[in-house]
C-alpha cells in the first residue's frame, strides 16, 4: 500500500513557470491600460459636463438679463404710453387747427389763384412751405404730384419731406394714399413709361422718423392699428402680384426696393417670408440701400451665405458693400474681391470682341464697359479708404487713357471740301448743277464735264479721256450718243464761257489730272476708322 502523506508535513511548493509569469505581466499591463483609458474617458466626460454646465449657466444668465430687460422695456412702454399719447394728442390738435387755418386760407385765396401748391418753387423755404401746405390739408394726390414733378430736386425733397410730414394729421395714411397709384400695383396702364419707384422710396424713407415714438424711439411706431392692417394688406397684394409679373426674376428693382422699404417703415416684416426677402435682396443687390434693408428685414444671420452667393454670381463689387455693412471684412477681404471684379470685366469685354461681327461697335462697348468697371472700383476704394491696400494710380491712368481715346474718336475727320475750281482763264465759276452730274466722281480733282453734256459735239476734246482708273471704284461717265439725249443743247448760255477746253479750240487745255491711289485709300481708311 502506498503511503499517505502526512497533512502536517511540509511539502515543497511548485515553482511558477516563465510562461505563467509572462501571462501575469501581460494581464497587469492590459489592466493598467484599460484603467488609464477609463480614467481618461471619465475625465473627458467630467470636463464636457463642466463645460456644458458653464454654458447653461451663461445661457440662464443671458436669458435672465433679457427677461429683465424685456420686463423693464414693457414697464417703460406702459409707463410712457400716457406721456406719448399726451404728446401725440397735443400734436394732433395743433395739426388739426393748422389744417383748418390752411383750408380757410385756401378758400379765401381761391378767387385770385394765390394758393397754387403745384406751381414753381424758387428756393428751399418755398419748397418746404408748399409741402407743409399739402400735408396740412391731407392732399395725398397733390402731394404725390408735387413730389413726382421734382425728381431733379431729390436731395432737397429727401430733407424737407420729413419736416412737412410732421405737420400732417395722419402722416402714415397720407403716405399710403399718396403712393397708391403705383404701389402695390401700378394702376396707370401699360402705356405709361414713367417709373415712380424713386418717389415711393423717398416718401417711405421720410415717413420713418416721423412715426417713431418720441419717448422710446424705433421700438414703438406711432401707427394706428387700422393703418398698420392696411399696410399689411398692401404687402400681401404685392406678393400675390409676383405671379402676374413673371415671378421674382422679372420684377423691376425699384418695385423691390419700394416693397422692402414698405415692410421696414411700417414694421410688418414676417419671419416666414425670409426666403422671399433673401431672393429679392440678392436679385437687386446692386442697389445702394440693399445692404441696410437686408439687415432691417432680418437677414443679418444669413449675410455670410448671401455674400458668398454674390461672389459666385460675379457680383464682387456688391459683395464688398454687403461685407462692410455687417462687419465681415476679415472673412471677405475687399481688395481681392475688387481685383477679381476687374478681371471678370476684362474677360467679359474679351468675349464681346470675339462674338461681335461689328468690330467698331464692339470696341466702343468694350471701352465703355471697362470705364464703368474702373469708375465703380475707384469709387469703392475712395468710399472705404482702401488707398493703402489698393493704390488707385494705375486705375486712374487707365481711365484717363480710355477717356482720351473716346475724345479723339469724337473729333470729326478732315473731309476735303467739294470745291469747284476755276478755269485756267480766270473766268466765272460754272453753274452749281455742274457739281451734280450723274456718275461724276467727287474729289479734290479739277472738275471735268462729261462729253455727253457738252453744248457742241463737232469739236474734239482737247485731250483724250482719262483712263478708267481715274474713277476709283465708281463707274466712268457713259458716253451717251447725241441722238438719244432728249432736248437740244444750244451754245453756252450768256455769262458762262466754254469750260475746261471742251468744244472750244482757243482755250488752252489744262494738264490732265493725276490720280494718287495711295492718298485716296489712306483718306478713305482714316474716315472709316473714325466712324466706327
From Swiss-Prot:
Belongs to the Frigida family. Residues 406-432 are annotated as: Disordered. GO terms for biological process: cell differentiation; flower development. This is FRIGIDA-like protein 4a. Keywords: Developmental protein, Differentiation, Flowering. It comes from Arabidopsis thaliana. It holds the Pfam family Frigida. Expressed in leaves, shoot apex, flowers and during seed development.
